[in-house]
């Protein structure tokens, strides 16, 4: 049988967080450093732009990997990086060009692997919910940020809908 905790034990526990400042703190407070976030929105509403700005902010708190499954290393991706001045985050930001989940898993097993992993997009991973859970549970000390397509105001597809229920932070992007 697993150990049970008292309320006082839980409240005394130091849970690592991201000490956002300014507009990021106003929007998200001080979220946990681990777990899952889901960003979703309709096409051309700014999901990737928002994700890149989030990546830039996260580089202040650790190492970030951005797996560009959907856009790859396209001109729009390059322009997005330029707008967010990602070159200033040298050493704390790396771009993965359509890295399969199996290769990403191997990368995350290494020492000094990224603290934060942005996957753009969930649909392009081809993962089902069981595979998503396996990835998340294999790396409990990482924060995964998945970008998802939308069907109206809901994430698109059964995996994305299930991830939405599981995610610690849920961000709908509209007209960003």
Regions found by a protein language model. Give the residues of each.
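Phosphate-binding/switch region of NTP-binding enzymes
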Residues: 137-176
